[in-house]
Amino acid sequence: AVPDKIDPRESGYVTGVKDQ
C-alpha cells in the first residue's frame, strides 16, 4: 500500500487500512 501518513501507534496500519 502507499500510505499518506503512517501512525506509529497503529503499527501495520496505514490510513486506517491494514497494509499487507
UniProtKB/Swiss-Prot annotation:
Main location: other
EC numbers, comma separated: 3.4.22.15
Organism of this sequence: Fasciola hepatica
Domain of life of the source: Eukaryota
Chemical reaction(s) catalysed: Specificity close to that of papain. As compared to cathepsin B, cathepsin L exhibits higher activity toward protein substrates, but has little activity on Z-Arg-Arg-NHMec, and no peptidyl-dipeptidase activity
Region of interest called Disordered, as start-end residue ranges on this chain: 1-20
Record protein name field: Cathepsin L1
Key word Cytoplasm present: no
GO cellular component terms attached to this protein's record: lysosome
Subcellular location: Lysosome
Species classification: Eukaryota, Metazoa, Spiralia, Lophotrochozoa, Platyhelminthes
Basic and acidic residues: bias regions: 1-10
Subunit structure comment from the entry: Dimer of a heavy and a light chain linked by disulfide bonds.
Gene Ontology molecular function, alphabetical: cysteine-type endopeptidase activity
